[in-house]
């Protein structure tokens, strides 16, 4: 899940610049996504997600088992591995953007909290994109137990990273 967990924090940290929606609004007068979703943030997030996946693959070659648990892989290597890593990273970013779109439709401003959705939007996007990239791999790796652990751990990790982002000045809100 590292390729899914890292893109959005790095997009926030190194983002900025031209918004993906180019400042355009919908018929309701609200921005499509808002200033928080930028091209630079998207591509930086994608790069860091991909690098995380590649580093994870390198570590798995040396340490396939951690604390007695066999760690998941991204397939047998080659292009399938690359596709899966990018699917997780891109899915994470699109999941976050998708929910930003709906938050704007609900009249919520950038940074406004939407509990549970804010913590899991990127995970759902990553899981959907991973499934679309390789349904067989997805079924092998993401058992009910694994998904349950992800859904429990992710909100805690999300809160912790947002608090850190708030204290270092990257985020305006600690959520």
From Swiss-Prot:
Enzyme category, top tier: transferase
Catalytic reaction(s) noted: 2,3-bis-O-(geranylgeranyl)-sn-glycerol 1-phosphate + CTP + H(+) = CDP-2,3-bis-O-(geranylgeranyl)-sn-glycerol + diphosphate
The keyword Membrane is annotated on this UniProt entry: yes
Biological process, per Gene Ontology: glycerophospholipid biosynthetic process
Compartments, as annotated in UniProt: Cell membrane
Major place of residence: membrane
Topology in membrane: Multi-pass membrane protein
Xref: HAMAP family: CDP_archaeol_synth
Protein name: CDP-archaeol synthase
């Amino acid at each position: 899940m590292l390729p899914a967990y890292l893109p959005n924090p790095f997009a926030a940290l190194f983002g900025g610049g031209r918004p993906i929606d180019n400042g355009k609004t919908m018929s309701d007068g609200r921005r499509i996504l808002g200033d928080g979703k930028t091209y630079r943030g998207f591509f930086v997030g994608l790069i860091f997600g991909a690098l995380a996946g590649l580093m994870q693959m390198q570590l798995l070659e040396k340490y396939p088992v951690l604390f007695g648990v066999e760690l998941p892989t991204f397939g047998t290597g080659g292009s399938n591995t690359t596709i899966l890593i990018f699917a997780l990273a891109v899915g994470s970013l699109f999941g976050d953007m998708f929910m930003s779109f709906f938050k704007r439709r609900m009249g919520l401003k950038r940074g406004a909290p939407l509990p549970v959705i804010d913590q899991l939007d990127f995970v759902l996007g990553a899981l959907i994109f991973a499934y679309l990239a390789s349904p067989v791999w997805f079924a092998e790796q993401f058992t009910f137990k694994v998904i349950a652990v992800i859904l429990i751990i992710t909100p805690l990790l999300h809160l912790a990273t947002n608090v850190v982002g708030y204290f270092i000045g990257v985020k305006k809100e600690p959520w």
